UniProtKB/Swiss-Prot annotation:
HAMAP family: Thr_tRNA_synth. Gene3D superfamilies: 3.30.54.20, Anticodon-binding domain, Bira Bifunctional Protein, Domain 2, Threonyl-trna Synthetase, Chain A, domain 2. It is found in: Cytoplasm. This is Threonine--tRNA ligase. It catalyses: tRNA(Thr) + L-threonine + ATP = L-threonyl-tRNA(Thr) + AMP + diphosphate + H(+). It comes from the Bacteria. The keyword RNA-binding applies. PROSITE patterns: AA_TRNA_LIGASE_II. The keyword Zinc applies. CDD domains: ThrRS_anticodon, ThrRS_core. Belongs to the class-II aminoacyl-tRNA synthetase family.
Length: 582
């Protein structure tokens, strides 16, 4: 069931066309700003971009003009021509383009290729379409800042993004998807629904969980804890900092230092914010002598870690600098490994299904170039993961070289509303850290026996999982996860007492409910509850008091009058079963 990712596959017609669209856009921008300095302009998954150093800041109002000029170039049916020349000739050609000159200096060959169309030429390996008229369906989307070569110490360029497809129908479909994705963007919904906030005064990538988001997170964490206790895990807690020497022993200081924060001096010793929880769990395991009969031992923690990310890649909750992992580490004998990984995959699938995720892909990531340990152990660990995937009948792709430095891993990646993949559950087999920390148990023969270790998360980080969950449901969480599950709306002041009585009964069942007794009209109250994506609105008036019923209106617009007792039973059943249906 494994498919190898083929990085050597030929360039598709679509990718070629998108690359050509980037060149056409560059020519259009140069016609508006002849003094522009050009960065790079590749094809990307859904289109293209090009980076420019311009005399003024672009605004969204500039995009239609650039697009108009692009369309004129397309209609001109200009040929794309490839030329080869020496690097010295190319330096003369790009004498006024400093970024191109820098790229030229990095090329080791003495001969380089350029592409021309119309009055434009670019340093480029190609290939391109034959004529500009082949670029038929494109749309400029946005402008963003991008540091030259991704280096925050280099100039900030202006990046123009565009979408491009082989036909207009495919482009229209993609633009419709973008429109829907914009509605579901967790950054937008996070603000509207008051789930979380980010503040530059605190720092980039550091999240405040607001009350509505905090209750959703709490519910996820409580469910996570109960499920882990049921499955034989022990809950633990660990500190947020540790001495640098600990990370030197683990190998993180050598292999992972660029993702760690700078050390802080405490009483003459160097400490650092933890990027991982694993080393703490290892020391807990070593807290006393253990027998092989105790294995497997499973330690689980909702542990907050800190990893450096460049400011340019921070993205709402999806890419942050401080986050809480649903982390666990399993210590077991070698012959217990496969069974334990099978169990972890079963738990991960159970979690994914419970939260209603349907779009995700599974990757088996193998040995990277920089690694520790013996090859035979790497092969054994990789084989264990593959067998566990096949035992669970989970289709997967092999992702060569994407394992961590101490072992191979299974990655389950959630797909967001834009089709982008975000890291979710991960399972890693590790023989190296137990060796580095001399982890062993007393075997049946009374001698020390080596221990294997499984690193795993079944949600990923709470922050990233919340971003995926928010976009999955467009902020309209299932009833069991909704910050407010019901809103009781009295039609007039005389109905407020009855509304409060119903709310009190629901609160006794731990339902999150409020009464909207404000002076606004009933329609305004219903509208505001719908905007807050509250699953159920219970309208009560004279009839409802007389019959002990409620007029139930769901956030999707369906309406039904039913006895209050019946509604309460229905809601409690949906909460208990964690139904994704309203």
């Amino acid at each position: 069931m494994a498919n190898q990712i083929d990085e050597s596959k030929p360039i598709s017609d679509l990718e070629i066309m998108r690359h050509s669209a980037a060149h056409i856009m560059a020519e259009a921008v140069l016609s508006m700003f002849p003094e522009a300095k050009l960065g790079i302009g590749p094809a990307i998954d859904t289109g293209f971009y090009y980076d420019f150093d311009l005399p003024r800041t672009l605004t969204p109002e500039d995009l239609p003009e650039i697009e108009t000029r692009m369309n004129q170039l397309v209609k001109s049916n200009l040929p794309f021509r490839r030329e080869e020349m020496s690097k010295d000739e190319a330096r003369k050609l790009f004498a006024n383009q400093p970024y191109k000159l820098e790229l030229l200096n990095d090329i080791t060959d003495e001969t380089v290729s350029i592409y021309r169309q119309g009055n434009f030429c670019d340093l480029c390996r190609g290939p391109h379409v034959n004529y500009t008229s082949k670029v038929k369906a494109f749309k400029l989307l946005s402008i963003a800042g991008a540091y030259w070569r991704g280096d925050e110490k280099r100039p900030m360029l202006q990046r123009i993004y565009g979408a491009a497809f082989l036909d207009k129908a495919s482009l229209a479909e993609y633009l419709n998807m973008l429109e829907e994705a914009a509605k579901r963007d967790h950054r937008k919904l996070g603000k509207e629904l008051e789930l979380f906030s980010l503040h530059q005064e605190i720092g980039g990538g550091l999240v405040n969980w607001l009350p509505n988001g905090a209750i959703v997170r709490h519910l996820i964490e409580e469910f996570w804890k109960k499920e882990h206790l049921k499955r034989g895990y022990d809950l633990v807690y660990t500190p947020h900092i540790a001495k640098v020497d600990l990370w030197k022993t683990s190998g993180h200081w050598g292999f992972y230092r660029e993702n760690m924060y700078s050390p802080m001096d405490i009483d003459g010793e160097e400490y650092v914010l933890k990027p991982m929880n694993c080393v703490y769990h290892i020391l807990m395991f070593k807290n006393r002598t253990r027998s092989y009969k105790e294995l497997p031992i499973r330690m689980a923690e909702l542990g907050t870690v800190y990893r450096y990310e460049r400011s340019g890649v921070l993205h709402g909750l999806s890419r942050v600098r401080g986050f809480t992992q649903d982390d666990a580490h399993i210590f077991c004998l070698y012959d217990q490994l496969e069974k334990e990984v099978v169990k972890v995959l079963d738990l991960a699938k159970f979690m994914i299904d419970t939260f209603g995720f349907t779009k995700y892909k599974v990757m088996l990531s193998t040995r990277p170039e920089k690694y520790v340990g013996e090859l035979d152990k790497w092969e054994y660990a990789t084989d264990i993961l593959a067998k566990a995937l096949e035992a669970n009948q989970i289709p997967y792709q092999v992702d060569p070289g994407e394992g961590v430095f101490y072992g191979p891993k299974i990655d389950i990646k959630f797909e967001d509303a834009l089709g982008r993949a975000w890291q979710g559950p991960t399972i890693q087999v590790d023989f190296q850290l137990p060796e580095r920390f001399d982890v062993s148990v007393v075997g049946e023969d009374g001698k020390d026996q080596p221990v294997a270790m499984v690193h795993r998360t079944v949600l990923g980080s709470m922050e990233r999982f919340m971003s995926c969950l928010t976009e999955q449901y467009g902020g309209a969480f299932p009833a069991w996860l909704s910050p407010k599950q019901a809103m009781v709306i009295p039609i007039a002041d005389r109905h407020t007492e009855f509304a409060e009585k119903l709310a009190c009964e629901l609160r006794e069942e731990e339902v999150r409910v409020e009464v909207d007794s404000r002076s606004e009209t009933m329609n305004q109250k219903i509208r505001q509850a719908q905007l807050a994506k509250i699953p159920y609105m219970l309208v009560v008036g004279d009839k409802e008091i007389e019959t002990q019923s409620v007029a139930v209106r769901t956030r999707t617009g369906s309406q039904q009058v039913m006895p209050f007792a019946e509604f309460k039973s229905m809601l409690l059943a949906k909460i208990k079963t964690k139904s994704t249906e309203i």
